[in-house]
Amino acid sequence: MNTIERALMHALFVHLHHNIDQAVDFKALEELNRKVSQQWPGALIVGPGDDAAVFQMPGIEGYLVAKQESHCSPCVPRPYDAAATGAGGAMRDVTAMGARAIFLLNFIGTRSLEKEVLVGPCGFVGKCTCGKCKVMTSQERLDLMVQGLRDMCAVMDVFVIGGGLSTSFTDIVPAVVVAVIGKLITKEPLTKPAKVAGDKIIIIGKTASDGNDTLFRAGLVPEMRPAVALFDEERTTLEASLAAFQTGRIHACSDLGAAGIGAAVCESARYGGFGAKVDLSAVPVKGEELTAEEILICETQARMVVQVSPADADEIMGAIESKNGIAAMIGEITSDDKEVFEYRGQTVATIPNKPSKEILESLKGGD
């Protein structure tokens, strides 16, 4: 297990599930689902395990899609971008199911508004040693977070229909939680799991070196660079994705969020019972020299991956490009039980669908 494999597997099998029981009251959720299923049998069409939930509401024709997401820690160094990318990420999750986002609700929890907070790379430790941080009031930071949410909604034509605020938080990290609701535009919901061995994997959008949290924790980069909000690119990716969906030829789809291409491909293949082979050299990147691990794992915004049969690939690429989207074929689904990532002809990471007990213990123990 090399360093890149360790970083990606830690993200897949440990970090993405870390402390989730403290963020989600599973007993309350189970009870709520039980009550809903009793009152509206069969209402939940796609539940936990995919990018968003798909459900039916009595008296409303068609399917609704909803996603709730928190984006808290990134608000310490970059409150504006973090709030905007939290909203944009939830919107992409809704889009990935074959829907167009319509409404957003939000909740923000922060310190008392008159309290001072340190915003920047050193915000977590409370003392600036980098010279890049700024001291501001909690009110000023709140204003930035609210503006980030509003600006993303404005670009994406999503209505903010409600929100909540608490100023009783004492932690350095504020809480930013958004819920996005949309309407399905495809005949049936799109889902994350891979469907057919041999399907081509197409990426929409360009990759950069921001959103490198996973790499930073693994010691593969010297500085954490939170994801940057990409407003116009988000809108372009939205319209390009919807154009691809309307061909009716998409087999699987996933938003690129935490751990980037690596997580999206590995989860899709694993959930479908397949493997995958990806050429990272084929990934469109922004004009900087990215390393293989940055292309694989960085969480650059405004990206999506879809899977299609080889015969339909050109049609899908054309649909994406008709909306000025950037698209590239980067790999294919295989009948294997692992995901193989190559860069310039060399294998840089091989991720098993079922890591051994020893590997999992090593990841959890940080050995």
Language model regions located:
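Short Gly/charged-rich anion-binding patches and loops
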Residues: 89, 148, 239, 264, ...
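Glycine-/charge-enriched secondary-structure boundary and capping motifs
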Residues: 1-23, 27-28, 132-134, 152, ...
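Glycine-rich phosphate/pyrophosphate-binding loop regions near the starts of catalytic domains
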Residues: 2, 16-235, 243, 276-284, ...
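Polyanion-binding loop/helix "lid" in catalytic or ligand-binding cores
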Residues: 224-263
